[in-house]
Amino acid sequence: MDEELLQRQVPQALEAEQSVLGSMLIDERCVPDVVGMLQPDDFYLRQNREIYETIYTMFNFSEKIDPVTVLNKMKERGVYDEQRSYDYIAQLLKITPTAANVKQYCTIVHLSLIHI
């Protein structure tokens, strides 16, 4: 069994994790709010955590954040998966129609951590 699965229980916030990431990709103006509320380890899925770590790092270095720059930075960091990363980013954009509710999504992710 995957050691990560043994150490963590499945939270009920996977959709909220995806919506947080999608919001940051849609509108980089919400990134400071998210960075103030969530840490990379708050993301349960490895793929979500790697995307968030990438955005988090880009934010800390005042780099522009959008789907193209994030995918490029993921390649630089060695966390880009040729089979999945591009499609997953596209999926995040598709399922997140607006960044307006990003603080609520962050709260849902945060509250799921309390129940682990």
Task: Explain the meaning of each model-derived region.
Residues 114-116:
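Conserved small/polar residues in nucleotide/adenosyl-binding loops
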